[in-house]
């Protein structure tokens, strides 16, 4: 298992609340790639890649692709990821975050 950094040094880009908006996420990643310090820049996703938008699976795939291309990427789970994990039975979750019907019908 890879160690999880507890301290980040150097430049940081923070991305949050993507909500399945893959075209916007692609544009953000393309803009970051143009930065002269990208090789040492951390890219931190602060949650909510999924839910609401048109392509939550695509947003997760873009994140996974970025992890393969750039060694300084991390993702903090947001409430929507926790709700999804609870709905899938991966974690215990309170009833109020059960989006099973909504996700099954929408996605």
Which role fits each region the language model picked out?
Residues 39, 52-107:
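Active-site neighborhood of divalent metal-dependent phosphoester bond hydrolases
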Residues 1-62:
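N-terminal active-site segment of His-dependent metallophosphoesterases
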């Amino acid at each position: 298992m890879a160690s999880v950094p507890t301290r980040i040094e150097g430049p940081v880009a923070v991305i949050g609340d993507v909500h399945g908006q893959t075209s916007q996420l692609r544009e953000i990643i393309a803009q970051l790639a143009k930065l002269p310090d990208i090789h040492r820049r951390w890219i931190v996703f602060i949650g909510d890649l999924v839910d609401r938008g048109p392509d939550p699976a695509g947003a997760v795939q873009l994140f996974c692709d970025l992890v393969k291309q750039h060694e300084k990427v991390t993702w903090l789970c947001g409430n929507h990821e926790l709700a999804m994990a609870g709905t899938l039975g991966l974690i215990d979750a309170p009833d109020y975050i059960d989006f099973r019907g909504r996700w099954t019908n929408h996605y």
